Amino acid sequence: RFTDPKTLAHLLKYDSTFGVYNKKVESRDGAIVVDGREIKIIAERDPKNLPWGKLGXDVVIESTGVFSSATSDKGGYLDHVEAGAGAKKVILTAPAKDEIKTIXLGVXDHDINXDLKAVSNASCTTNCLAPLAKVLHESFGIEQGLMTTVHAYTNXQRILDLPHSDLRRARAAALSIIPTSTGAAKAVGLVLPELKGKLNGTSMRVPVPTGSIVDLTVQLKKKDVTKEEINSVLKKASETPELNGILGYTEDPXVSSDXKGNSH
């Protein structure tokens, strides 16, 4: 559904979770202007009709959640780079429904090459889980594991009870702990092939607007590993060039709201 520039400017300026944006934000015909920089607003139902080539756009971020297949009757993510749209590359901000290179920063970004037209950046939960699994596997070896993500509610749920194809997501998001499915654990095998088939997981949506957690339980190949050893390797990994800024480490007694605005 198309949203006008005035509404987009307002929602950027005033955010219920992160507060008021401290830069000047305004709207004009066909654009919003953020701190003096104009950002064009274009709305098309079919991605092949978007004028990326004319605008000189090299890389498109496909974050609608609608075009998760390369091609389909309603359009696909490759339409951004083929069929006339004219971009050179497309990055999905969600798992793809078909085979595509999946990249999690700090874990599999060495697999990116210039020949790829499209990559998936996986899900938020996979990006949380994969660096942790990578460090544990490289240090101690993972035989198998189970993950639970306790996740903030999202727009895929209902704010009040209302019909939804998933009867649990049909319930008011801010009033219940809502079990739901997740493919994040299995998707780790896409960015860490050596863990393919070794991890599984469940998800709980909880009544917070931001701040989620992954609880990972693993059976390690190395026996008698202590808590201190695990904490030590995670802390050291968080300070490496590979994972600095991606994996964080703290021993503070923090809660989910303390992660709000954290850039890792």
UniProtKB/Swiss-Prot annotation:
Residues 245-264 are annotated as: Disordered. InterPro entries: GlycerAld/Erythrose_P_DH, GlycerAld_3-P_DH_AS, GlycerAld_3-P_DH_cat, GlycerAld_3-P_DH_NAD(P)-bd, NAD(P)-bd_dom_sf. The active site is at C124 (nucleophile). Keywords: Cytoplasm, Glycolysis, NAD, Nucleotide-binding, Oxidoreductase. Disulfide bonds: none annotated. D-glyceraldehyde 3-phosphate binds at S123, C124, T125, T154, R169, T182, G183, R205. It catalyses: D-glyceraldehyde 3-phosphate + phosphate + NAD(+) = (2R)-3-phospho-glyceroyl phosphate + NADH + H(+). Pathway: Carbohydrate degradation; glycolysis; pyruvate from D-glyceraldehyde 3-phosphate: step 1/5. Its EC number is 1.2.1.12. One of its GO terms (cellular component) is cytoplasm. Catalyzes the oxidative phosphorylation of glyceraldehyde 3-phosphate (G3P) to 1,3-bisphosphoglycerate (BPG) using the cofactor NAD. The first reaction step involves the formation of a hemiacetal intermediate between G3P and a cysteine residue, and this hemiacetal intermediate is then oxidized to a thioester, with concomitant reduction of NAD to NADH. The reduced NADH is then exchanged with the second NAD, and the thioester is attacked by a nucleophilic inorganic phosphate to produce BPG. This is Glyceraldehyde-3-phosphate dehydrogenase. It comes from Borrelia hermsii. The gene is gap.
